[in-house]
Amino acid sequence: ILAENIDVSGTVQSRCTVNVDTPGIYGNPNAYTLTTAPASAGQVPIVRFDVTLANAYFAQISYPTAFTSSPSLPDTVAWTGAVTVVQTSSSDMSGYHAASTTSGSMRQYALTIAGTTWFDATSIATYGGGQNKAFPGGAYKAVVLAQCIAQ
């Protein structure tokens, strides 16, 4: 028997995109705290999700729980933060935050309406394992993870 395999291929383009709207900056209000709070000279990062197909994606956003680069830190860093809806392109999206779920530092939103949603991700890093030790001098970087997940 003579047989032939025939390839069938295709490309799927995501109907959900993630863009940085505002980069985050850590303020240093005291020796042992780094925070994105504007009152402490920080800047809260804002991420924008653009969705052209309703009920097809989740937005997953996680505030940082570790530095991706920093001076050597021999002691513990305690992390807190929050992810919230900042603005939407439609009032029909007003229930997004109330309907969201959390797991650790990650918050997930069902993107049920086509349009644009802006989220912020605040974070506070406290050094010293509860002893409020001074952060060593140097540059610190952490990452907010924001992704579209197909439902």
Give the ranges of each region predicted by the language model.
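N-terminal small/polar-rich segments of proteins
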Residues: 1-78, 99-151
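Short, surface-exposed beta-strand/strand-loop-strand elements in extracellular ectodomains
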Residues: 76-88
